[in-house]
Amino acid sequence: MWVHPAGNVLIDPLPLNEHDENHLDSLGGAAHLIITNSDHVRDTARILLFTGAKSWGPHAEKEQFPFDCDDWLKDGDKPVSNIEVFCMEGSKTPGELAILIDETTLVTGDIIRAHEGGRLCMLPVEKLQNRELAVNSIKRIDAVKSIEAEIPGDGWPIFKNGHDALIELAEKL
């Protein structure tokens, strides 16, 4: 969750238990909920009922997404101030989203992961739709020099030197 003056933003939330719901409520609830790809829907429908948040999903998955979002995001969209959307082509789902917050924190769905502390890796090749497009998407993100933190949908977050970790990943590809 990102605490934001225009309402808190949830990105790919996990299912919430009663304690989580109470804690979220104590922080002001959630006004916005972004799903990076259809594999991260999880308990979103129930969370939306609980919070009343506006929901966004990847535009490229609009026709087959498991539920109707309030709006659909494409590359370059800015659904909330200080959030920029990147579409990560070639991943396991069409138009997977990566979310850049305050130009310093990157939240990714599945294409970029971290199964080892301090090191990023790419989704295994056999799960990619198109390796070349996936690599190009990652290299496009590594051009954002202001990234300090990288929070992958799968694995360990990197809280310092996120840009360096992205460059290291891109060089391995």
Identify the role of each PLM range.
Residues 38-41, 79, 93:
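Alpha-helix initiation and capping sites
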Residues 15-58:
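Active-site metal-binding motif and surrounding structural segment of the metallo-beta-lactamase
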Residues 46, 67-70, 162-163:
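Short secondary-structure transition/capping segments
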Residues 41, 62-65:
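Short gly/pro/ser/thr-enriched loop/turn and capping motifs at secondary-structure boundaries
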Residues 50-54, 72-76, 168-169:
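Short, hinge-like loop/turn segments at secondary-structure boundaries
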Residues 2-16, 26-30, 57, 64-65, 84, 88-173, ...:
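Metallo-beta-lactamase
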